[in-house]
Amino acid sequence: MRDRLIAANHREYGESYEQLLFPTPSQAQRALAHRAELLDDLHGRVAVGYGGTKLDCTGLSPGCRICAEGGWSCLFITGRCNCRCFYCPTAQTENDPPTTNAVDFRTPADYVGYLERFGFRGASISGGEPLMNPKRSLAYVRAVKKHFGDAMHVWLYTNGTLADDDLLRQLADAGLDEIRFDIGATDYHLDKLRLAAGVIPTLTVEIPAIPEDLPRLKGMLGKLRDAGVMHLNLHQMRLTPHNFEHLSARGYTFLHGEKVTVLESELAALEVLQHSLDNNIGLPVNYCSFVFKNRYQAQAVRRRNVQFMVKPFEDITDNGYIRTLTLLGETATVTRQIENFKALSIDDDLWSKGNSPGKLLVHPQLLKLVNNSAFR
């Protein structure tokens, strides 16, 4: 597995891969020791969930709870952004139509229908920068909230540069439940964020954990709380072909995994969480690791979509994959097994003849009724 991940990462970046700094054995050992020390200190003080990929789960924002439970849809309202953050994973220069999961939604009504069809409980408006197209963003927020009311939690991501009193009040009137500011895009200025306090019900800051900004971020946790921020979400920084030059020039130590991530980013996030608890700041901090995003968010998509594809004789795994149990045997053996199912009045939707006479597809719950020695 390790070699396969390294090979995949190497292929993604080609010749540029050689520019990346990966930890030496001694560096890796020190980093693991520091990480273990932080986690040991946090043990018993935080709730760790989702296979150890997310903490602290005790004070998650309403939107984060829905995301973690797999009930969230993210609508990219536009592909354009007016900021050029060094950590951004994509170019953010295209004026794309509203899109999610590679499906375009040309009208708010289309998106409402999608949310209803798949049973979502939360929807976010993202980009790009959604406030570059306020009319479109307002239309989609308004349509979703009008249709679902309190049954749908709606939030919006923004760098805040285009926010003003009037626009924030319009978003509140449209029913927006939560707004998330990326203050890393504005050098951690809080003036626009303060405008949203008391206007939008839930005020959240969501930023990458930038290692060199660790002292600054620790020092402003109290200011965030006093400004009305209710939740701080910290993401692990991830390398992409778009941000490769920016991240590789900063001397970060990179880690192999399902994608290449920044070692120091995770350590910084854990230190911020530790600092917040040690000093009783009262601002819930959520570390959203790349593994959580890549594994559990993808799992949620699979489990939601698979409901429309799974056949009655198939099973769904915890990870959202379709599992088919195939019995192979002589034609006469398959025939006898089918006759046994019929004699027991087993629903014939729970089994199916295969595409060859010696094959039988059965739901796992029927396995106890099968003479396993007769099949292979």
Identify the role of each PLM range:
Residues R11-L75, Q92-T100:
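N-terminal [4Fe-4S]-dependent radical SAM core
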Residues G79-Q92:
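Local cysteine-cluster metal-coordination motifs and their immediate loop/turn environment
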Residues P89, L138-G149, A172, L193-G198, ...:
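Surface-exposed amphipathic alpha-helices with a cationic face
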Residues T93-F105, F118-N133, H147-A163, L171-H189, ...:
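Core AdoMet radical
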Residues Y111-L115, L138-R142, L168, L193, ...:
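Generic structural signal for well-ordered alpha-helices
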Residues L193-Y296, K311-G320:
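Conserved C-terminal portion of the radical SAM core fold
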Residues V301-Y321, L325:
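Short, low-complexity, polybasic intrinsically disordered segments
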Residues T335-R376:
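C-terminal functional modules
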